[in-house]
Amino acid sequence: MNIFADFDARIKKTLQDIDLKPKDGGELDLSRIGVEPPRDASHGDIATNAAMVLSKAVGQNPRELAARIAEALKADEDVESVDVAGPGFINLRLKASYWQRELLVMLNEGTDFGRSRLGAGKKVNVEYVSANPTGPMHVGHCRGAVVGDVLANLLKFAGYDVVKEYYINDAGAQIDVLARSVMLRYREALGESIGEIPAGLYPGDYLVRVGQELAGEFGTKLLEMPEAEALAIVKDRTIDAMMAMIRADLDALNVHHDVFYSERKLHVDHARAIRNAINDLTLKGHVYKGKLPPPKGQLPEDWEDREQTLFRSTEVGDDIDRPLMKSDGSFTYFAGDVAYFKDKYDHGFNEMIYVLGADHGGYVKRLEAVARAVSDGKAKLTVLLCQLVKLFRNGEPVRMSKRAGEFITLRDVVDEVGRDPVRFMMLYRKNDAPLDFDFAKVTEQSKDNPVFYVQYASARCHSVFRQAADQLGLVDLDRVAMGSHFEKLTDESEIALVRKLAEYPRLIESAAIHQEPHRLAFYLYDLASSFHSQWNRGAENPDLRFIKVNDPDLSLARLGLVQVVSDVLTSGLTIIGADAPTEMR
């Protein structure tokens, strides 16, 4: 249960009980009332701004109103004390019995604790990675892959019906260049000396194998075909090979998509999907024939100094109108974006999230304009931009050669440090802030390495369970037994740990609402820190050890507390896509 939602309801009922009314009549607007943890834990367990946001409406000084509300809240059987602070904040401290009851709820729910109905089954499409199928994924793709994947997992846990999607950019000019690059490698595999790879083609050695496979399958047949026919075959085989490589890289990172949507699908039957999308916009009055003034700076490839078919995107929030069709009748890349969005919307998605690299910042307004125009404002589209990842080794920047074809791949990083450190650390900064990734730091065993610190807490929980088996003979810990004596958990440090656990449902919902999966990584680190601190207290004070051989009931209660810590760590790490180890190796 979300205890903050619980007390939000209790506080609003209290406002009704004291018959609080607006001075001008009508009903009070309670929507701005906030109920959250105090910024300073010493101030209490629950804080609310109710008096401050309602004082003007009821015509009463905020502190006086706060005192009135506070007095009424003292009647709540779970409230130990109520204080008014600052300009009118109300801080509540709850009784230990309340936390003991809540801990029992957490224990009974297991790893489902924190799962929410917030999404109410609403369909959400999360598109992420969508790297061009022209080669292996580099480290720059890694952050978006993790952010998108964890956000999708988080939304599922919060009750949304989520589809993870990858858009395969397999219809652009870069694919033609890729096919010609592989054709060269094919000729090389047949024994021809190709010399240095010509400028403009893909030089990477990863294409050598594709050329060899084509040579093994076709022999010299492709050379005997008309060039267009041969290139079409090479293109299909190469896209399949590149996507197989990309899927393998993503699998190594524990990233899995539900849908792989081919851009070429939009161009089937003379680009029927694109034509239908443009016709739909035309019927709504969003399309016209016109000529755009030349933009400042470098000219985009879809600008022409002649009449084009244009989208009135400025009428729906964009900076400039956008070309949909060139003067020669061919469609712009942007027209494909329109058709792709319409396809999602037609499949019942009213909420779509695009996770893109920071270099796509210029696309945000045009994509939002498409969403408004296609859905008549009914669909919500959010674009999350992921800033760059800078690689370091022992604090020194990792130099990458600018020579063509040489870069650090996603697989290089995963193979060196492991999947879990990569996933966790890619979340340890908000997506729109640059991130430094140090190969040495993410593998060191210290508090300064967040993923180690969190996974070590999970392992320590299980070490407590093993100690219980050795010292108390409790091999199969029973949750009913562990939860039967929570009234024995009275030490302030134990109650503080329960408070931290109780924040989890609110954390899940707030991270889902704001689409900020990094909040989960931060919370898990804080929870791990609280648990390690409790462990250390037991090392310093025998009375606070998790296992008291001479007090089996207290031991069971503390084991129940450890079990809930383990459950929440497991739940959070599962959402992140990392393991919750039972021991460190």
Swiss-Prot record:
One of its GO terms (biological process) is arginyl-tRNA aminoacylation. CDD domains: ArgRS_core. Keywords: Aminoacyl-tRNA synthetase, ATP-binding, Cytoplasm, Ligase, Nucleotide-binding, Protein biosynthesis. Transmembrane segments: none annotated. It catalyses: tRNA(Arg) + L-arginine + ATP = L-arginyl-tRNA(Arg) + AMP + diphosphate. It comes from the Bacteria. The keyword ATP-binding applies. It is an enzyme of class 6 (ligase). It is found in: Cytoplasm. GO terms for molecular function: arginine-tRNA ligase activity; ATP binding. Its EC number is 6.1.1.19. The keyword Protein biosynthesis applies. GO terms for cellular component: cytoplasm. Its main location: cytoplasm. A motif ('HIGH' region) lies at residues 131-141. InterPro entries: aa-tRNA-synth_I_CS (IPR001412), Arg-tRNA-ligase (IPR001278), Arg-tRNA-synth_N (IPR005148), Arg-tRNA-synth_N_sf (IPR036695), ArgRS_core (IPR035684), DALR_anticod-bd (IPR008909), Rossmann-like_a/b/a_fold (IPR014729), tRNAsynth_Ia_anticodon-bd (IPR009080). Monomer. Belongs to the class-I aminoacyl-tRNA synthetase family. PANTHER family: ARGININE--TRNA LIGASE, CYTOPLASMIC, ARGINYL-TRNA SYNTHETASE. This is Arginine--tRNA ligase. It comes from Brucella melitensis biotype 1 (strain ATCC 23456 / CCUG 17765 / NCTC 10094 / 16M).
